[in-house]
């Protein structure tokens, strides 16, 4: 099954997440099919907090991909901001 989920990057105590399309059997930070955005939970000032290609999310969901709980909230936030 294909899922759209967060893949953690960044330094210790400073998380940065890529939003990726990946096989659900792959490790969290392992192999992915496509990178469709990022999420920076500790963005400050003018730093961009969320960038997400909503068209690609819609395309993958149409193909049968499922969203993780956190990504579903982020997609809703991105649609509201756009």
Curated annotation (Swiss-Prot):
Keyword list, A-Z: Ribonucleoprotein, Ribosomal protein
SUPFAM superfamilies: Ribosomal protein S16
Organism: Glaesserella parasuis serovar 5 (strain SH0165)
Pfam families cross-referenced by the UniProt entry: Ribosomal_S16
InterPro entries xrefs: Ribosomal_bS16 (IPR000307), Ribosomal_bS16_CS (IPR020592), Ribosomal_bS16_dom_sf (IPR023803)
Name this polypeptide is given: Small ribosomal subunit protein bS16
PANTHER family in the cross-refs: 30S RIBOSOMAL PROTEIN S16, SMALL RIBOSOMAL SUBUNIT PROTEIN BS16M
Disulfide bonds: none
Similarity field: Belongs to the bacterial ribosomal protein bS16 family.
GO molecular function, one term: structural constituent of ribosome
GO CC annotation: cytoplasm; small ribosomal subunit
Gene Ontology biological process: translation
């Amino acid at each position: 099954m294909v899922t759209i989920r967060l893949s953690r990057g960044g330094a210790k105590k400073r998380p940065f997440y890529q939003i990726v399309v990946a096989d659900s059997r792959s490790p969290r930070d392992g192999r992915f099919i496509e990178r469709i955005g990022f999420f920076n939970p500790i963005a400050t000032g003018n730093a961009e907090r969320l960038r997400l290609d909503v068209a690609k999310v819609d395309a993958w969901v149409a193909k049968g991909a499922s969203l993780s709980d956190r990504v579903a909230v982020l997609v809703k936030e991105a649609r509201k901001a756009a």
